[in-house]
Amino acid sequence: MRVAIIEFVTLDGVSQGPGSATEDTSDGFTRGGWLVPSIDEQFVRRASDWLDLADGLLLGRRTYEAFARDWPQIAEPDPFTERMNTLPKYVVTNTLAEGSWNPTTVLRGDPVETVAALKSQPGRELQVHGSARLGAALLSAGLVDTLRLVVAPAVIGSGRRLFTHPSESVGLRLRSHAATATGLLLLEYETTGVAPLADYAGVTELVDPDRAA
């Protein structure tokens, strides 16, 4: 299977609490709900298409517990609820004895090793939703194939950042991009190994001399 990370993030890199003021108040965070004003039909269609690619959800404990609390309580039909509730869930944790949001498998031990073993099985995508710390660890370990970001037109100024302390550099190739009418950026990247580096040597070779004249 391939591993895909799906993250909502502000322009200043905050990934905490996109859905509501009470979604994640850890560390005193009070500015949740920053994604909601920008949700529109184009975003819903794209996010639904992404979820259609999943054969399982790969979650950290904190995100798993929040999802297990909230998703089963959603009664009205929408493009996500049934799939979120019925997809296999894999929660990476050494502190949770068992899962309450079925079907759930608890992956104990070293996160990189357990996810690598799961990734080796046949299937389409294992999708990391939220779970920024888990996503960063997997990205650094070279286990992530695809990174999908929804960038909200907001600067929050506080909260947990996405990929704050990755231990390895990662190169990305842009595969698709779109902007919604409300200002959301929908970005999809594929990983390309270590991020390339170079020394700046001017742009002369990149400029068409006829246009420059």
Specify the residue positions occupied by each region the protein language model found.
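Portal/gating segments that form or line small-molecule/metal binding sites
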Residues: M1-L143, P153-A213
